Amino acid sequence: MRVVYSVEEVEIPKGVSVSIERTGPFDYIVKVKGPLGEVTKEFKNTPVVMSLQDGKIVMEVFKARKREYAILGTYKGILKNMFLGVTRGWRYKLKVIYTHFPMLVKVQGNQLVIENFLGRKSKITLNIPKGVKVEVKGKEDIVIEGIDRELVSTFAAAVQAATELHGDERPSPHGREGGLGVVDGIYVVGYEHIKS
């Protein structure tokens, strides 16, 4: 069933400025500025019409079906994350877990380097995206911070995925004699805001 018209409004927090630029018939660029910096997102081929009205971002959709409602909800979540990013920031925490071969994780320039994963001689290197700050605390903790949640969470997931075993490398989930198997890796253990 189609609904002729639906609208969602997102309140702009105090201390945050927003600009919406229409770049094509169905394309928008939204810029959000706050005390911690600026986040820019591009919305392409969208059925949603965006505008600024009375301190709110108004999103309208015409002849909406389930897909359009889903997009409306997704955009609302993205905008709220942008507001939280420029006012409070995002911090993801990762834990380095190893049982036999001690893994060494360090930041070199704009790369995160993982050495001695499962005793391998080859290094795993990941390029740190612009706008993301990575800090290695001790031997077991990694902290990833930034104002763009999409960038920060995607990089945290990439770090975890870099130490996952795939295909023939992956041992039995029960390991030898019914043990845990290989638990070595880097895992996302939580996230929080930089400012409370």
From Swiss-Prot:
HAMAP family: Ribosomal_uL6_A. One of its GO terms (biological process) is cytoplasmic translation. It comes from the Archaea. SUPFAM superfamilies: Ribosomal protein L6. This is Large ribosomal subunit protein uL6. InterPro entries: Ribosomal_uL6-like (IPR000702), Ribosomal_uL6-like_a/b-dom_sf (IPR036789), Ribosomal_uL6_a/b-dom (IPR020040), Ribosomal_uL6_arc (IPR019907). It comes from Pyrobaculum aerophilum (strain ATCC 51768 / DSM 7523 / JCM 9630 / CIP 104966 / NBRC 100827 / IM2). The gene is rpl6. One of its GO terms (molecular function) is structural constituent of ribosome.
